[in-house]
Amino acid sequence: MSGKIKVTFIINDGEEKTVEAPIGLSILEIAHSNDLDLEGACEGSLACATCHVILEEEFYNKLKKPTEAEEDMLDLAFGLTDTSRLGCQIILTEELDGIKVRLPSATRNIKL
């Protein structure tokens, strides 16, 4: 399915940037293609928590539950909340049209 949805990124100073994003890409990919500061040190391989984002509950509840591997990485995230997810694991669908994604003010990159 091809198409686009609206994604709003809330940057740590409260500024909002709304973009049109292709369905099927991840939040991490959309952030990078729009020059937003979402690190993604492991490039989506579930080996870090630098693409940690915070969602509104409405959209968090539309996603599949995080895998155990994602939960393990989220445990390392700075500023973890009940609606935290990794941006690399959120794949855009039509159902997520209008999603708001808050970028935390800091990330923690743990090098093993």
Swiss-Prot record:
SUPFAM superfamilies hit by this protein: 2Fe-2S ferredoxin-like
Superkingdom field: Bacteria
Protein keywords: 2Fe-2S, Electron transport, Iron, Iron-sulfur, Metal-binding, Transport
Pfam families: Fer2 (PF00111)
Names of required cofactors: [2Fe-2S] cluster
Function (record text): Ferredoxin are iron-sulfur proteins that transfer electrons in a wide variety of metabolic reactions.
Protein family per UniProt: Belongs to the adrenodoxin/putidaredoxin family.
Protein name according to UniProt: 2Fe-2S ferredoxin
Species, as recorded: Rickettsia montanensis
Gene behind the chain: fdxB
